[in-house]
Amino acid sequence: MYEVTKFGGEGKRLEDYREIIGDEALEAIKAKAENLKDKSFVHVNSTSFGGGVAEILHNLVPLMRDVGIDARWFVIEGTNEFFNVTKSFHNALQGNKELRLTEEMKKLYLEINKKNAEDIDLTQFDYVLIHDPQPAPLIEFYEKRQPWIWRCHIDLSDPNLEFWKFLRQFVEKYDRYIFHMEEYVQEDLNQEKVVIMPPSIDPLSEKNMELSESEILKTLERFDVDPERPIITQVARFDPWKGVFDVIDVYRKVKEKIPEVQLLLVGVMAHDDPEGWIYFEKTLRKIGEDYDIKVLTNLTGVHAREVNAFQRASDVILQMSIREGFGLTVTEAMWKEKPVVGRAVGGIKLQIVDGKTGFLVKDVNDAIEKTLYLLEHKDVAQEMGKNAKERIKENFIITKHLERYLDLLNSF
């Protein structure tokens, strides 16, 4: 286990958000933090780069420190075999019923967690927060002396029960369980320990801050994207759950009506996702020689600022995930006043108000129809984008997230 000491949001101050959230909201957060001054708090997850959890922590940890909490962040380490096992957990918990949990998988999963527990004494902190299934068994290997919280960032609405029953024996030892939405809460857990808390974006991070028109245009030019032609974009990891093939199918049908349309597939290759590389290659094969589809990743120099530029340059954002714990890429696009066409699953349903801040769709044909409509009705797209930003501002930005954490810690 190692500690993350460099943060994307280094030097973040609550005061920086006054203009965005207003005086009253800011002072309320300060008041809630008063009781927690000098308390120590530790986050533990499985990667410091790639995916929504790491991105949130890069900004949330510095903000927690700014309000007086001694917040730290540790990342568990493991072999490729371990991360293959945890990827199976992820897929099974999100609904893959064909996967089987073997004794070897259980053994490796517990061994690596035990090894990580030997690296650092988590009982030295006043509060411990464990993110997702990868490090969930850590609680087994300590004599718990303080509140332990487990946070689930994935869509648990229809899990493979073999995996869930095995995981549950660790989860139920925690003092609180955080889920993004009610529909992810498992009935066999103690309901009194359940906390519903959606994640958030940071409006001042490089991914979401305002960019000049000239920077956006330069970024498009650097990656050979034509700003004069319509742009459809999906930002997502290369993962079967993200519906990337469906996005390509939507684009191809839209292109029959609007031949000049371009598609940007923007994604991060994350360190804890060995399966992602296989799916990435499959995606390239499906695309073939269509040069109006750009595959843009951290491997080709795409980082937070570039993603920001691509989202701001897009006419329509797609999110065709088959399962989606929350969908922070939807949140990001809505913050940038973009209409999102998203499959009506998981956290996407929580964010998009159908017909007002974007469109919720059930399948590829529905997505084709709504994407064409938005490309052909710019005024509607613009109005939806404005509504979308308001919705995010009220519900899903990092200061609201921080406040919800303060409420939780104050409840112990």
UniProtKB/Swiss-Prot annotation:
Taxon lineage: Archaea, Methanobacteriati, Methanobacteriota, Thermococci, Thermococcales
Keywords (A to Z) from UniProt: Carbohydrate metabolism, Glucose metabolism, Glycosyltransferase, Magnesium, Transferase
Induction, as annotated: By maltose, less efficiently by trehalose, and even less efficiently by sucrose.
Database matches in Gene3D superfamilies: Glycogen Phosphorylase B
Any one GO molecular function term: trehalose synthase activity
NCBIfam families associated with the record: TreT_Thcocales
InterPro entries reported for this sequence: Glyco_trans_1 (IPR001296), Trehalose_Metab_GTase (IPR052078), Trehalose_synthase_GT (IPR053462), TreT_GT1 (IPR049438)
Cofactor: Mg(2+)
Protein name: Trehalose synthase
